[in-house]
Curated annotation (Swiss-Prot):
It is a peripheral membrane protein. Residues 886-980 are annotated as: Disordered. Disruption phenotype: Increased numbers of germ cell corpses. Reduced number of gut granules in the adult intestine. Endosome/lysosome fusion defects in coelomocytes. Double knockout with either sorf-1 or sorf-2 results in larger endosomes and larger lysosomes and thus suppresses the endosome/lysosome fusion defects in coelomocytes in the vps-11 single mutant. RNAi-mediated knockdown results in a reduced number of gut granules in embryonic intestinal cells. This is Vacuolar protein sorting-associated protein 11 homolog. It is found in: Late endosome membrane; Lysosome membrane. CHCR repeats lie at residues 407-554. InterPro entries: Clathrin_H-chain/VPS_repeat, VPS11, VPS11_C, WD40/YVTN_repeat-like_dom_sf, WD40_repeat_dom_sf, Znf_RING, Znf_RING/FYVE/PHD. Residues 917-937, 947-960 have a biased composition (Polar residues). A zinc finger (RING-type) spans 803-843.
Length: 980
């Protein structure tokens, strides 16, 4: 340790310089050189002798010598690549300022660019110049004299012609203070220049404005110094002066301040010893002090030199050693060289950074290691590792607070979890917060660490710090998920702060959750929702509406009413999305639905919820009048929603609505199934009575089938009424009715007795009518036989005068038929599309009659061969055998075209099938062959009896079973033959 407490290290190695030509021999090139002044420039150092010689020594230890002055050399200074010198060439006082270009050598001497005579510039004194300083910009130069006079010039030092004349006197002569031993120039902003003047007794500073006027002068507290005991750093503007007791530090910018600057910062380095030389090299100050020699080997070795290298910023001694005899110190490039009295040259080589740091770490001097690493160019690579070791060192000693300060500096290198595990104990939570804060400031945190920090604040009760941290997050200076922050505030019951945070970041759902569920401020919640956009109002009301409806009913309903009035576009703002909150509160539901109905006329999207509400009411109390059903339910049902309404009605078992929807959709079958499922016979009968005529038959059959399976004796009266309706409708054959009802084991004969008796009476009447019809038909057949006989054996006179097709008088050529129809030839050809010789007017009637006959015979044949005749009859009944209305309708359709040559596409006979149709198409009922159109036939020819359907093919006798009603010619017309 030094006398003032600085630590001492050995960061330099002192080694003797050997001759580069003969490495085994020591370098003795500077032996017997008496160095009186020196300066360093680039990689070279210039050593000046008092006799005028200059030695140039490079950092590769190459030598060069030239004679700068013939008589004496007083001072050397380097600026840029140039060398400036002050000296005398003759015995008289005639000081010369020479500017050298060392890179340009002529005749073994550097080129002299300019030579300025300095004595004429100070005519009031005969003292020679002894000191010089030039600014590195080569725009200003200052020269000092032995009598204390100082001259200053501002301009281009290399080229200005006025350099020979226009100098400014900065300081007058002061013989009492002695000669000027040192000069320095500092250029400051605002065109100000500070000139430091060092004499043997004092240190002065002069402030010049625009390089012409001295505006300030200060005399500092240092006692002056010799020419080798001061140093100046132009980059920082700092002057360091070494006196016997102290080292003084003066800054150029402080000299401008009128209130300070006289007293400089000082350090007691080498106190009590004579200072021989002060040299600055980088961050180090090398100081040579004179000491009494403790080991005297020679007669002139009374004194020795102590070399000390200081790091002022780090406050430690980087190197120190004693040197026998007196020595000189100078800088060549970045190397410090020591020239001993006997001409031995030594160099101080700084150890590499890793070695220095290793030394410090081993000595646990981490603070110095940190400082050295910070001041080194490559120290950043080691800095975090040093802090980590320093932190571990302090943590091991129990100094957790200072240890965390070191761990802070390891962010980016040391895994945060390593540090956090050490400080998870509750007693160290304060230090953990410090580390996590730095981690967040460095933007190397994650969400988990943010949560830990906020929870640590809350656990300590540091609400202020917690909120400051939250504010930093919300201000954007920290990055974190707002939801995590919100959840932590909510966890530690900072409800107001949590709600404000959620509000600020538009976390509306979270804000309302705090306000309603935690703070229980329901009115505030309604107010909060009312200030949101309409879409958010609907969404938030749907989520929190139930609680608000319970605790702030009036406020909520009023808010909804206002929003509905303000937003009438039902397509964009569907308020029915929040209808679920009213479930269970029928009064509120009705009020809300009234709001919705008044909102817009186009409320299709609202109908289903409205219907649901009304059906819920119906389920509670089903005693509704038809008018109320119409007003509250039926009027809302339309084609778009009838399916959804039907499903809802089935869900709530709303029978009137189900009946209404199915009836309006003409879904009588589904309605029948619904009534059957409920086993409501009365409703089934009502349905059958109210349905259309087209559906009655099917519905009666469904009803009878249901009764046959599920009816009981208690339903006898209802069944009797049902049979009356069936009897009145005449839609179902009684045999089918009896067959379906016979399947029920519970019904008695009394249920169908009246129905059977009534049917039998009707059948008796029909039988009597059929008998009368048969008699009439037999009579007609007899008349028809006479007509046929007349046609076969008597001459026929054709007396038709008009065409049966165009109803105009006949003109030859004509075509006459035995059926009393006549046609123009061209009219006949128009209607005779198939080329046959049949009467167009009678052809359709004959075909239909023949089809009926064939179908009848086919039915008789099937009935005779059937094993179960009743089953066959029932099958044909289902096909409409006795459906007279259907027969008449289809017959009338077939007769629409009296000249149709083909059969109707759909037969009216229920016994028709493909086989019958084929047979009917191959048979003809016409017994006579017609003549060709070109030949008029006036009389009939005798037909072959074998082709006559009215005679037996074997005996030729007349058939006794001939049915006159099947004669296509009808009853015979009165004879017009005058010979009959």
């Amino acid at each position: 340790m030094t006398e003032f407490g600085w630590r001492r290290f050995n960061f330099f190695d002192r080694s003797v310089v050997f001759d580069k030509d003969d490495p085994k021999q020591k370098f003795m090139g500077l032996k017997d050189v008496a160095v009186d002044c020196w300066c360093s420039s680039g990689g070279s150092v210039y050593l000046g002798e008092a006799k005028g010689g200059v030695f140039q020594l490079t950092n590769q230890f190459s030598e060069y010598y030239w004679k700068a002055y013939q008589k004496s050399l007083a001072s050397l200074h380097s600026a840029d690549k140039y060398l400036f010198s002050i000296g005398e060439d003759d015995e008289t006082v005639n000081t010369l300022l020479k500017i050298w270009d060392p890179e340009r050598v002529e005749k073994n001497t550097p080129h002299v660019m300019r030579t300025i005579r300095m004595s004429p510039l100070n005519p009031t004194s005969s003292s020679p110049a002894c000191s010089i300083a030039v600014h590195s910009s080569l725009q200003s130069v200052v020269v000092g004299y032995t009598d204390g006079t100082v001259l200053f010039y501002q301009g281009d030092v290399l080229h200005d012609k006025s350099l020979n004349s226009r100098w400014i006197k900065v300081r007058d002569s002061s013989v009492g203070e002695g000669s000027v031993t040192g000069l320095a120039i500092a250029v400051l902003p605002a065109s100000k220049t500070v000139v430091f003047v060092i004499t043997q007794k004092h240190v002065h500073s002069y402030v010049l404005e625009n390089g012409r006027t001295v505006i300030a002068h200060k005399k500092h507290d240092a006692n002056g110094a010799t020419a080798d005991c001061w140093t100046f750093d132009e980059s920082t503007g700092q002057l360091i002066v070494a006196s016997r007791e102290m080292l003084f530090f003066y800054d150029a910018d402080q000299c401008i301040d009128m209130d300070g600057g006289e007293v400089g910062r000082c350090l007691q380095l080498g106190r009590g010893h004579e200072k021989l030389q002060l040299v600055a090299s980088g961050q180090y100050l090398a100081l040579l002090t004179k000491h009494h020699s403790l080991i005297q080997k020679e007669r002139d070795s009374e004194f020795m030199t102590m070399l000390s290298v200081y790091d002022i910023k780090g406050q430690y001694v980087g190197f120190s050693c004693s040197l026998p005899n007196l020595c000189r110190l100078f800088i060549a490039g970045s190397t410090m060289l020591v020239l001993s009295h006997d001409g031995l040259l030594s160099e101080l080589i700084e150890k590499n950074l890793a070695t220095k740091l290793d030394i410090l770490v081993k000595k646990s001097m981490f603070d110095v290691a940190v400082l050295i690493a910070k001041n080194s160019r490559d120290g950043g690579d080691y800095l975090k590792g040093i802090h980590a070791k320093y932190g571990n060192y302090l943590y091991g000693k129990g100094d957790y607070e200072n240890a965390i300060q070191q761990y802070k500096e390891t962010i980016g290198m040391l895994e945060p979890s390593y540090v956090m595990k050490r400080y998870l104990d509750s007693s160290k939570i304060k230090e953990l917060c410090i580390y996590l804060e730095c981690l967040h400031d460095a933007k190397r945190d994650n969400e988990h660490q943010t949560k830990i920090l906020m929870n640590a604040y809350a656990k300590q009760g540091e609400k202020k710090k917690l909120m400051e941290f939250v504010n930093k997050i919300t201000d954007g200076t920290r990055v974190s998920r707002m939801r995590d922050v919100f959840e932590i505030l909510l966890k530690w019951n900072y409800l107001a702060e949590a709600s404000l945070l959620a509000t600020k970041f538009q976390m509306h759902e979270d804000a309302l959750n705090v306000i309603i569920h935690h703070m229980h401020k329901y009115t505030m919640g309604v107010t909060y929702i009312s200030k949101m956009p309409i879409e958010s109002v609907i969404e938030m009301t749907g989520k929190f509406g139930r609680d608000l409806l319970i605790h702030a009913r009036d406020d909520l309903m009023h808010m909804l009413w206002e929003k509905i009035q303000e937003n009438t576009d039902a397509k964009k703002n569907n308020f029915m999305r929040i209808f679920d909150i009213f479930m269970g509160d029928m009064d509120a539901s009705r009020v809300f639905l009234s709001y919705i109905e008044n909102q817009t006329n186009e409320h299709d999207e609202f109908i289903i919820p409205i219907l649901e509400c009304q059906m819920r009411l119906f389920k509670v109390n089903s005693d509704w009048s038809q008018e109320r059903l119409e007003e509250d339910i039926y009027r809302f049902i339309n084609k778009k929603n009838e399916d959804a309404a039907l499903q809802m009605a089935q869900l709530f078992d709303c029978t009137p609505v189900i009946e209404h929807i199915l009836m309006r959709c003409h879904k009588s079958k589904e309605l029948m199934m619904y009534h059957q499922k409920k086993r409501d016979l009365e409703a089934i009968i009502r349905l059958c009575q109210s349905c259309s005529k087209e559906e009655k038959r099917r519905l009666w059959l469904d009803a009878l089938s249901f009764i046959g399976k599920h009816a009981t004796a208690r339903d006898e009266l209802i069944i009797i009424d049902l049979l009356k309706e069936i009897e009145a409708s005449e839609q179902i054959h009684p045999l089918v009715v009896l067959e379906l009802l016979a399947k029920n084991e519970h019904l008695t004969i009394s249920s169908v007795r009246d129905y059977i008796i009534a049917w039998l009476r009707k059948q008796q009447i029909i039988i009597e009518e059929d008998r009368n019809t048969i008699k009439e038909n037999n009579k007609a057949m007899g008349e028809l036989d006479g007509t046929v006989e007349s046609l076969k054996f008597n001459a026929q006179i054709m007396q038709v005068t008009k065409c049966s097709a165009c109803d105009t008088p006949l003109q030859l050529p004509t075509v006459h038929f035995l059926c009393k129809h006549a046609y123009h030839v061209h009219c006949f050809e128009s209607y005779n599309m198939d080329g046959s010789d049949k009467c167009p007017a009678c052809q359709t009637t004959r075909d239909t009659t023949r089809d009926e006959e064939i179908s009848y015979h086919k039915f008789q044949k099937e009935l005779a061969e059937a094993s179960n005749g009743m089953e066959l009859i029932a099958m044909y009944l289902q096909r409409g055998l006795f459906d007279e209305k259907t027969k008449k309708t289809k017959k009338s359709e077939a007769k629409k075209d009296p000249f149709s040559t083909g059969r109707a596409s759909t037969t009216t006979n229920p016994f028709d099938d493909d086989e019958v149709t084929t047979i009917s198409r191959t048979m003809s009922t016409v017994s006579s062959n017609m003549a060709t159109p070109s030949r008029q036939r006036s009389i009939t020819r005798k037909d072959d009896d074998s082709t006559n359907p009215f005679f037996n093919s074997d005996s030729g006798t007349r058939l006794s079973t001939y049915d006159e009603s099947k004669n296509p010619f009808g009853a015979p017309a009165p004879s017009t033959n005058p010979f009959d």
